[in-house]
């Protein structure tokens, strides 16, 4: 809170696969200064679509804070389908958006076409942010933006303004880096990239380990060629 000093909204991650524990946190912890919470679809225990709905129902009823849903089946093991997302969005007014990282453009488009007016779709995948904005998404919660906040946010702003030609140029500039970030997993990828740029040490806690040297050198080569300003 002190670092951002009101310049940007604070989105706090409050999620997990224990609904009761999340509700307890929301009802008893101090959320002063928090603008909204980001809550991931329950992971590992693979609930049904009805279970996902009931999970978010309990969360929405436990707080007045705005809630951003987070669908990332590649990490959680279960996909929240469009109809479930839309049902939650319609039933709970404090559910204001979804960070969609399913990689399924058809599913995302279905949400965008049928969502309530007070509900936004946010990309959770850098590589499809540009096409998703052309369909009606409002932005991105980004990985590569940690390394290139200025240039990547410029792409987003151009796309939101309808300047697709210039936005696409930036999208293509980053294309290989989008892939390299996840070759050896993330956050190892973005930490390696930031290390190449001289911004941080390349240290991780187990079970995460640094990227392979081949990935690291590939990043160095592309960054040298692109000469992109952070």
Where on the chain are the PLM-derived regions?
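Active-site beta->alpha loop and helix N-cap motifs at the rims of alpha/beta catalytic domains
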Residues: 1-77, 87
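C-terminal alpha-helical cap/extension of soluble enzyme domains
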Residues: 11, 28, 134-137, 141-230
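Short, contiguous clusters of charged residues that form electrostatic/catalytic patches at enzyme active sites
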Residues: 20, 24, 54, 83, ...
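Catalytic alpha/beta core domains of metabolic enzymes, predominantly
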Residues: 61-62, 75-178, 182
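Glycine-rich phosphate-binding "P-loop"
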Residues: 71-72, 94-95, 205-206
């Amino acid at each position: 809170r002190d670092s951002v000093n009101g310049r940007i909204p604070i989105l706090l991650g409050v999620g997990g696969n224990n609904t009761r524990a999340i509700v307890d946190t929301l009802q008893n912890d101090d959320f002063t200064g928090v603008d909204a919470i980001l809550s991931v679809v329950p992971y590992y225990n693979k609930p049904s679509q009805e279970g996902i709905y009931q999970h978010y129902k309990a969360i929405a009823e436990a707080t007045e804070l705005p809630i951003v849903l987070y669908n990332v089946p590649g990490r959680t093991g279960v996909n929240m389908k469009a109809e479930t997302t839309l049902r939650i969005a319609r039933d709970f007014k404090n559910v204001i958006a979804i960070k969609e990282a399913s990689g399924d453009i058809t599913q995302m488009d279905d949400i965008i076409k049928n969502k309530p007016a007070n509900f936004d779709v946010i990309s959770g995948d850098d590589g499809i942010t540009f096409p998703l904005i052309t369909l009606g998404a409002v932005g991105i919660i980004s990985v590569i933006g940690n390394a290139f906040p200025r240039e990547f946010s410029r792409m987003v702003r151009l796309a939101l303004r309808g300047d697709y030609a210039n936005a696409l140029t930036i999208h293509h500039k980053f294309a290989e880096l989008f892939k390299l970030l996840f070759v050896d997993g993330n956050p190892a990828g973005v930490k390696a990239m930031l290390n190449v740029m001289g911004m941080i040490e390349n240290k991780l806690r187990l079970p995460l380990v640094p990227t392979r040297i081949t990935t690291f050198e590939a990043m160095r080569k592309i960054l040298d060629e692109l000469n992109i300003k952070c």
